[in-house]
Amino acid sequence: MTGDRGRLISSKLLEHKTAYQVDRELSGTILFFKATYGASIYKLVYETIDPDGKPTIASGTVTVPKKPDFALPILSFQSGTMVKRDEASSTTGFDGNYGIVAMWTSSSGYLTVIPDYLGLGESELFHPYQMAQPNATVIIDMLRATRTFCDQEGLETNGQLFLTGYSEGGYTMMAAHKMIEEEHPEEFTITASAPGAGAYDMSGVMVDLMLSGEEYPSPFYLPYTLFAFDEYYNLWESPSDFLKEEYATLLPPLFDGTHSSSEINAAMPAVPMEIMEPDVVDAFSKDENHPLREALRDNDLYDWAPQSPMRLFHSTGDDLVPVENSRLAYETFQENGATQVELFECDCGTHGEAAAILLFLGFAWIESLADKSQPLSLNHHTVPEKYNLLSVYPSPFNSSTKIIFTLKEGSEVTLTVHDLLGKEIETLAKGRFPGGRYEFPWNASLFASGLYIITLKRTNSQGMK
């Protein structure tokens, strides 16, 4: 059972900023530039599936440039590691790191999509941290919900789809790129992707780093991964089966979605593996087919061949996700026949220090590929913002069809059908309607075959199809 994946459940305007306000927000950061457009951020709640394939809900944000004169490219940005549920984009809006990204990209002329992921925002599941399939599906379903949102709001996109993200967002972006090309090539076409500093080799590079016995700046990464994989792969009966008694009691409550990563790090030893039972570590180290190792191997993302342009970004000084992850992915992609993949390395500092720099460089590359010259269609130039006549579906039709329109506020509305001579032949709706989405059927079996004009009139405004 997969439910109605990508069905938009609700959308809500969270905040609007003018171009001047965006300039003030970004002033003094590496992302500073002259904003071209204001930006409005919306919270979306939509239907998706959990790691077991059962229907569930997820949330995210869509940020829209204000009044561009061209059809919009879509930029899907995947956020980095979060453990606190209310740190997600749909909760923070324009506040926080991801609000800055949304302002920056949308005020440059992109319709910016930021999924919250399962287990964050509205989702009450445990976040499937560093797991490819559930994160890819929630990203893809967010894109589907965004498509519906654009229809409802009368937003015109140009068919370009860019993917990017950093850290966990680099990993989840890679998972989404792979799934789109392998499972949904007829539904989505990726223009280009720019993954940054993702842990694409979970079973190799990242395992070796943890087993090294060295201190690690963000030790909470290890229990986050262990709890997620145990939750969805059923590796152990209880935390005490793999964690030392002290940590089996202390750590699970800290991952309930109400605690920050800094709180969890404060409860962790500097060497992450010290939380685990030595016999479990020993068994894992010696067994290439250990269930945990097999589960990690299932979620490696380096052994395939991207077909769309991709540029990987990574700092050689990354202290959390070694650059070897991107090097291995790049080399394997080439060996597998990929011809449009590049690797950009720089000595940009640690994982945290490099984030803004690499995101900026990735966005600059995306900017070089984006098409912002496609003019809006006639309907989008002439239909006022307060309402929108969305579609007549099916069209053409045999004997019946339905007309869909939206109102952003309560209005007096008349929906009529005219022939090509301008004669009104039927009134489908007339009266005052509250804001919302409406569908009206039209049975045309009593009229001759031909072309007809659907007219939606609102006070002092008119739209036609």
Name each region found by the language model:
Residues 129-151:
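Alpha/beta-hydrolase active-site loop
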Residues 144-216:
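Primarily recognizes the serine-hydrolase "nucleophile elbow" in alpha/beta-hydrolase
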Residues 381-393, 397-465:
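C-terminal outer-membrane/trafficking sorting elements
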Residues 52-59, 65-104:
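Short, surface-exposed "cap/lid" segments of acyl-processing enzymes
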Residues 311-318:
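Short beta-strand/loop motif that positions the catalytic acidic residue
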Residues 293-294, 320, 327-374:
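C-terminal catalytic histidine-bearing segment of alpha/beta-hydrolase fold enzymes
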Residues 196-303:
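Accessory cap/linker subdomain of secreted extracellular hydrolases
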Residues 1-69:
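Catalytic-loop region of hydrolases
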